């Protein structure tokens, strides 16, 4: 009997093959897990960059720009997503469902949600005659990595990520909003992770655009942004209809408690999301909190919701954790006009669901 045909060596060959196959599989699974982990986040803080941007603003902080909204705030529970439900159904004929980022472009989703919610509220309150289109997140992402930082086309780099100050600068000072529609030679009707990656390198509009899409974006600026640094300011902003794009390193668990809150997690997140509603301990919500809308689709988190129509994919954050998130000083309230106090109709589209 030859050595190769000996049962002992046949078993060794089989075991070696099994081990090799297992190693290849584990390497593949690890690579996929790493890719998914990277694509879930994308906030890369640049404190110096944000400070430089804030120096460009006459009223950089919400305490200044939103003094009227803070002074007149009543501390009422406010649910801005209800305006979005109505506006989205009017524009698209279907319910609003939170999207899912495909690369580390969370900055564009956090600020995109903020701009969309603000526009829906303007429509609901009669400031706009037509229900708004959704912003194209790829444009915000590219603009935040290139034009928003004063860089030339093709200098964004291939790594993922951006920061709040760059997105705020792009939307309010050097660019603006491009909508989900065919525009400027691009069909932006649906989100494309590949387009986001390309535009993150080349800038808004991609390779060879040479500023054409920038000119279109400038027609629709998010006129006012202001730095928000604490719970009270954020709650006052939301009460007047101004969402807050929140950039932080605070992570969360993936199950909500009985009141719809998610507990702060052990592992940090470099992530941007959006605060879109508020509740107060002396109101029907019975706890101070802000509702945080994520960009991982509707099913990443489970557990009870409050109110019952709370958006899937969102969770409430308690006051202490909100303050920790905003302490990074890279989170911005957004508005298409100003930050004046608005006495919104809380008995209709902002009332508590039955």
Describe each PLM feature range.
Residues 34-40, 108, 112-116, 146-293, ...:
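Predominantly the structural core of cysteine protease catalytic domains
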Residues 20, 49, 77, 136, ...:
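Intrinsically disordered/low-complexity terminal segments and short unstructured peptides
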Residues 128-150:
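Acidic helix-start/capping segments at beta-turn-to-alpha-helix junctions
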Residues 15-16, 27-132, 156-180, 329, ...:
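Structured alpha-helical subdomains that flank or immediately precede key functional sites
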Residues 6-17:
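N-terminal Sec-pathway targeting helices
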């Amino acid at each position: 009997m030859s050595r190769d045909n000996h049962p002992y060596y046949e078993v060794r060959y089989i075991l070696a093959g099994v081990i090799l196959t297992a190693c290849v599989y584990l390497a593949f699974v690890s690579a996929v897990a790493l890719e998914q982990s990277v694509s879930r986040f994308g906030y890369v803080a640049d404190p110096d960059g944000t400070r430089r941007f804030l120096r460009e603003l006459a009223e950089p902080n919400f305490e200044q720009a939103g003094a009227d909204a803070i002074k007149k705030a009543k501390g009422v529970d406010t649910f801005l997503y209800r305006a979005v439900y109505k506006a989205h159904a009017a524009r698209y004929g279907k319910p609003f469902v939170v999207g899912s980022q495909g690369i580390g472009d969370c900055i564009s989703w956090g600020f995109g949600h903020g701009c969309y919610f603000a526009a829906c509220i303007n429509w609901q309150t009669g400031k706009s005659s037509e229900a708004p289109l959704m912003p194209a997140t790829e444009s915000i992402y590219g603009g935040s990595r290139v034009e928003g930082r004063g860089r030339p086309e093709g200098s964004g780099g291939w790594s993922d990520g951006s920061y709040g100050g760059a997105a705020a600068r792009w939307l309010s000072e050097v660019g603006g909003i491009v909508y989900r529609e065919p525009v400027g030679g691009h069909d932006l009707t649906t989100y494309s992770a590949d387009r986001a990656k390309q535009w993150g390198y080349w800038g808004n509009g991609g390779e060879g655009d040479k500023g054409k899409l920038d000119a279109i974006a400038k027609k629709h600026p998010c006129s006012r942004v202001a730095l928000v640094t604490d719970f009270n300011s954020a709650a006052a902003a939301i009460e007047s209809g101004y969402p807050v794009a929140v950039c932080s390193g605070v992570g969360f668990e993936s199950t909500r408690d009985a009141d719809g809150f998610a507990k702060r997690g052990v592992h940090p997140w470099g992530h941007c999301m959006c605060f879109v509603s508020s509740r107060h301990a002396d109101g029907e919500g019975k706890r101070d909190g802000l509702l945080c809308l994520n960009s991982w689709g509707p099913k990443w988190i489970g557990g009870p919701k409050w109110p019952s129509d709370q958006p899937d994919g969102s969770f409430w954050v308690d006051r202490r954790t909100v303050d920790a998130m905003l302490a990074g000083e890279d989170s911005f309230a957004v508005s298409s006009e100003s930050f004046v106090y608005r006495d919104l109709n809380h008995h209709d589209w902002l009332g508590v669901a039955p």
